[in-house]
């Protein structure tokens, strides 16, 4: 057909700013995304640059602007939907070969960075500040407050942190949005009722008194490593946050008084600041924030920590503070100033500011990294839960292309080659400095979740990437960029991450007993004191080892077969009585059940020969909606049972369920057809699928967005369906 006859269609993310948010919007035409080896840097360019350097399709898409594409033909066959979806998604590949996006959701990550930057005297660009304001005003609740994550009920923590952030960014206290927020905050008990995490940030800012929070003594860092009390045995994120918080608590560090801080002291409380009984606030935690009432053991721990502050030994305190500083320095050094995540990045930057000063390479290096977790979403700018998802999303995308037979096509050669190049440069080639002293897991050979600079080994990211690389490099058209030795090194690292009790965790094997959770005084989250066993990580390892041992049958075959058997044994034990598995990183039962059934397929278990798989299929089929799709609510993670999404069927949940059923060789072919048909109906004329409910989880019960999940898991589901059952006409206009 002549070019002039090609019918174009307009697409967009469908976002409209709230009236308050629109006041702070920047000129979206001037935003550009710079990338380098997975690193993201959104930059607001001058007008003349904007005129000469056109925005890419990916920039347009993520900014939520309208774009024009050739109209795709209405899919009749499953292959049509697969081709249309891939044609759209491949356009989102960045110049360095990866697929990137935001993984935002928690509403205290950006505010922590903004507060820390303010204290350290770091000036953020005006465009960045305005877009941060726009983001928050787009996500404000109807009552004027903010919750723990986007679209969650207002809490004292969320409202205080984001009110404070908006004031720092320049929004006046008389702004209608802040008047509403303050009214809601006072109704919930004011900032006096902050949970410990919020009290910490307000203390560091000088808008709360250290006497008002449960002490965070750094002395556990001096405990022998074999004792569970030593933070080296805690979950890696909890450990990193605790170390920096305990350092700042031990020094009673607070920012110098400024007019703004004085104003916040007046605005955040329901009584004059100087009249507050700060010691009485230690146990004053709002019911809007508490996940559970405190146990007697937790109350006893809090009392013991308070008593210890009166009898502490000065020598031990100094030694503990030195150790805390050493740990933070190790973390900042080993991650090229990034830290494991933006949450601990913010508090670690304050530690470096206190210990070394604003002009030190520590603070300057971290200041240069503030941009890394920031993403220009369609609602504005916010920090993600990590410095991106670059390796994870790219490996999953390559796998989707392989599952659908797309990677083999000549027209996709360059796309796959660039992805392989990115994956190759992203492998971690050395261990962190001071592995044992810094409580680190070896990393040589691993692939990280985000970028090589971040430098944390993750079991499932490494497993998914190894599998994708082996299959991609098996294509005749692909060069062998990742050597056999490097793949073997990655598998050796995975083998070393197995838990003694079977199964896999994410960052490191279990180090502490689950009884540590009894001492959880975060008030906000469940199951955050130690690492956990995850069906999704365990299944990813199974899929990886199955692929690896077929390609390299002589590399540690006995060990690999033993590990695969133990992983399968763990999955069978981890199944819930309802028939599903519960995820910790995605929503929720459908996500984990997808992975579990894929993992069990590698050891020959399916619906026809396994009661475990039969029960899982029955579980998934039970929750298929009348329209053919699946839709699970994030609240399932908290309730520990499947909860239907009130918004109805979701693209991601439908893809998860289909992947699981296909892997189990489910005999209910009609259910599979109806699921694929629903995905085809949900596809837009551009080939894309639109955003839906939150796709991910950080820690129970908090939600996150993983916007690429609706693409690569959906493409994998359709591709695997075609591979298993063949292509067929599934969607007719009259249906």
Swiss-Prot record:
It holds the Pfam family SQHop_cyclase_C. The active site is at 460 (proton donor). It comes from the Eukaryota. One of its GO terms (biological process) is triterpenoid biosynthetic process. Keywords: Isomerase, Lipid biosynthesis, Lipid metabolism, Repeat, Steroid biosynthesis, Virulence. One of its GO terms (molecular function) is lanosterol synthase activity. PFTB repeats lie at residues 129-170, 487-528, 564-604, 613-660. InterPro entries: SQ_cyclase_C, SQ_cyclase_N, Squalene_cyclase, Terpenoid_cyclase/PrenylTrfase. One of its GO terms (cellular component) is lipid droplet. The keyword Ribonucleoprotein does not apply. PANTHER family: LANOSTEROL SYNTHASE, TERPENE CYCLASE/MUTASE FAMILY MEMBER. Belongs to the terpene cyclase/mutase family. Protostadienol synthase which cyclizes (3S)-oxidosqualene to (17Z)-protosta-17(20),24-dien-3-beta-ol (protostadienol), the biosynthetic precursor of helvolic acid, a secondary metabolite which promotes virulence. This is Protostadienol synthase A. It comes from Arthroderma gypseum (strain ATCC MYA-4604 / CBS 118893). The gene is PDSA.
């Amino acid at each position: 057909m002549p070019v002039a006859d090609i019918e174009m269609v307009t697409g967009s993310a469908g976002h409209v700013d709230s009236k308050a948010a629109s006041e702070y919007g920047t000129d979206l035409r001037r935003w550009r995304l710079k990338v380098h080896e997975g690193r993201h840097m959104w930059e607001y360019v001058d007008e003349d640059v904007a005129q000469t350097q056109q925005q890419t399709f990916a920039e347009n898409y993520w900014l939520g602007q309208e774009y024009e594409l050739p109209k795709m033909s209405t899919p009749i066959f499953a292959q049509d939907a697969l081709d249309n979806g891939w044609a759209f998604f491949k356009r989102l590949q960045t110049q360095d070969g990866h697929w990137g996006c935001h993984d935002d959701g928690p509403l205290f990550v950006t505010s922590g960075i903004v507060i820390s930057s303010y204290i350290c005297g770091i000036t953020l660009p005006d465009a960045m500040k305005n877009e941060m304001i726009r983001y928050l005003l787009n996500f404000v609740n109807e009552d004027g407050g903010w919750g723990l994550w986007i679209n969650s009920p207002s809490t004292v923590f969320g409202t205080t942190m984001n009110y404070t952030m908006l004031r720092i960014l320049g929004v006046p206290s008389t702004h209608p949005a802040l008047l509403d927020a303050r009214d809601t905050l006072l109704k919930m008990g004011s900032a006096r009722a902050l949970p410990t995490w919020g009290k910490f940030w307000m203390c560091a800012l000088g808008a709360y008194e250290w006497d008002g929070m449960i002490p965070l003594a750094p002395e556990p860092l001096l405990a022998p490593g074999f004792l569970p009390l030593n933070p080296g045995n805690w979950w890696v994120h909890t450990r990193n946050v605790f170390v920096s918080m305990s350092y700042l608590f031990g020094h009673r560090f607070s920012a110098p008084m400024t007019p703004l801080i004085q104003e916040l002291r007046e605005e955040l409380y329901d009584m004059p600041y100087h009249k507050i009984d700060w010691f009485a606030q230690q146990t004053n935690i709002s019911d809007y924030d508490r996940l559970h009432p405190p146990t007697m053991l937790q109350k006893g721990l809090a009392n013991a920590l308070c008593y210890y502050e009166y009898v502490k030994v000065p020598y031990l305190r100094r030694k503990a503070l030195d150790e805390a500083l050493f740990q933070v320095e190790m973390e900042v050094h080993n991650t090229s100033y990034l830290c494991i995540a933006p949450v601990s990045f913010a508090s670690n930057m304050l530690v470096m500011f206190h210990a070394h000063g604003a002009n030190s390479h520590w603070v300057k290096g971290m200041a240069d990294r503030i941009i890394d977790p920031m993403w220009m979403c369609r609602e504005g700018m916010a920090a993600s839960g990590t410095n991106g998802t670059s390796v994870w999303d790219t490996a999953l995308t390559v796998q989707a292309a392989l599952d659908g037979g797309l990677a083999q096509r000549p027209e996709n050669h360059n796309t796959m080659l660039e992805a392989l190049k990115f994956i190759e440069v992203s492998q971690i080639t050395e261990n962190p400095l001071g592995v044992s002293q810094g409580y680190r897991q070896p990393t040589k050979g691993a692939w990280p979740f985000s970028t090589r600079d971040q430098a944390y080994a993750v079991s499932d990211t490494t497993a998914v990437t190894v599998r994708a690389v082996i299959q991609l490099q098996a294509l005749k058209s692909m060069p062998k960029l990742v050597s056999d030795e490097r793949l073997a090194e990655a598998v050796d690292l995975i083998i070393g991450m197995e838990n003694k009790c079977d199964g896999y965790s994410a960052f490191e094997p279990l180090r502490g007993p689950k009884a540590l959770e009894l001492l959880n005084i975060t008030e906000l989250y469940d199951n955050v004191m130690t690492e956990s066993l995850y069906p999704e990580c365990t299944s990813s390892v199974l899929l990886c080892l199955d692929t690896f041992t077929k390609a390299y049958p002589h590399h540690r075959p006995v060990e690999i077969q033993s590990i695969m058997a133990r992983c399968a044994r763990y999955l069978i034990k981890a199944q819930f009585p309802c028939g599903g598995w519960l995820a910790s990183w995605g929503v929720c039962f459908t996500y984990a059940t997808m992975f579990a059934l894929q993992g069990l397929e590698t050891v020959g278990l399916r619906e026809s020969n396994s009661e475990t798989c039969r029960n899982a299929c029955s579980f998934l089929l039970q929750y298929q909606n009348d329209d053919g799709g699946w839709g699970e609510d994030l609240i399932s993670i908290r309730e520990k049972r499947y909860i239907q999404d009130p918004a109805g069927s979701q693209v991601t949940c439908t893809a998860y369920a289909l992947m699981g059923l296909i892997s189990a060789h489910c005999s209910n072919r009609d259910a599979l057809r109806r699921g694929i048909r629903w995905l085809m109906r949900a596809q837009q004329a551009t080939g894309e699928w639109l955003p839906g409910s939150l796709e991910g989880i950080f820690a129970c019960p908090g939600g996150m967005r993983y916007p690429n999940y609706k693409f690569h898991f959906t493409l994998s589901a359709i591709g695997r369906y075609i591979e298993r059952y063949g292509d067929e006409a599934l969607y007719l206009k009259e249906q």
